[in-house]
Structure formats: structure tokens, C-alpha cells
UniProtKB/Swiss-Prot annotation:
Its main location: secreted. This is B1 protein. GO terms for biological process: sensory perception of smell. CDD domains: PBP_GOBP (cd23992). One of its GO terms (cellular component) is extracellular space. Keywords: Disulfide bond, Glycoprotein, Secreted, Signal. Gene3D superfamilies: Pheromone/general odorant binding protein domain. GO terms for molecular function: odorant binding.
Length: 130
């Protein structure tokens, strides 16, 4: 689940952004130890309640500064990065309002945010997210 993206609505995702996201995802995969099968299913929107997948998501969210060290979602950063993908400030705002949650652990928070985003936008993250 490699990731949401950076910056404001007027700026689109660049090849450099995509490469950074791929690199971050690969580094997080090494750190989390999540299996390729779990990642493949996650790319299709089938998120397993897997501790390693949750670690993967949290790692990516931290790298993108979507999650603070405290484990809370940084709503402004989350919206900024979403807007790079959606190119729609209003849509991003709705997603952030709906999907910004705080669970018992930072891993669970990242997992639940991801599930929420994918409910409305099943292909939102595509091959990047994990």
C-alpha cells in the first residue's frame, strides 16, 4: 500500500514522486516482512487483518508524514497528499473527514484509514500502495 502522495491540488504526481513511492514501499516491505501474496491481495482492495501488512501501511504512512510519531493521522498532510492524487480538493476533504480515525495502535489506525479510503475508491492506490 505504498502510498498516498504529496503536495497541493495544482501539482500533479511526477515520475520522481512515483519512484520515491516505489522505493518507500520496497523499504517498508523489507522492514515489515509482509508477504508478496498479502500485498497482491491488498492492491486489489482485499486487506487482510495481518500484523505485517499493518506494519507496512504504518511505515509508508510515516514516511509520507501522514501519521505522526504519536500514531495520530496528520489530517492536513493527509489531505494535501490525497489532493495530489485526486486533483480535487473537495473530494480529498470528504475522504479525510470520513477516514481520519484513531485506533488503539498506530498500526491499526493506518489499517483502518486505508480500508476506509478503499471502500469508496477501490483502485485508489493501485500498484503503488503496497
Amino acid at each position: 500500500l505504498t502510498s498516498l502522495i504529496l503536495l497541493v491540488a495544482v501539482q500533479a504526481i511526477t515520475e520522481e514522486d512515483l519512484e520515491l513511492l516505489r522505493q518507500t514501499s520496497a523499504e517498508c516491505k523489507t522492514e515489515s516482512g509482509v508477504s508478496e501474496d498479502v500485498i497482491k491481495r491488498a492492491r486489489k482492495g482485499d486487506l487482510e487483518d495481518d500484523p505485517k501488512l499493518k506494519m507496512q501501511l504504518l511505515c509508508i504512512f510515516k514516511a509520507l508524514e501522514i501519521v505522526a510519531e504519536s500514531g495520530e493521522i496528520e489530517a492536513d498532510t493527509f489531505k494535501e497528499k490525497l489532493t495530489r492524487v485526486t486533483n480535487d480538493d473537495e473530494e480529498s476533504e470528504k475522504i479525510v473527514e470520513k477516514c481520519t480515525v484513531t485506533e488503539d495502535t498506530p498500526e491499526d489506525t493506518a489499517f483502518e484509514v486505508t480500508k476506509c479510503v478503499l471502500k469508496d475508491k477501490p483502485n485508489f492506490f493501485g500498484d503503488l500502495f503496497v
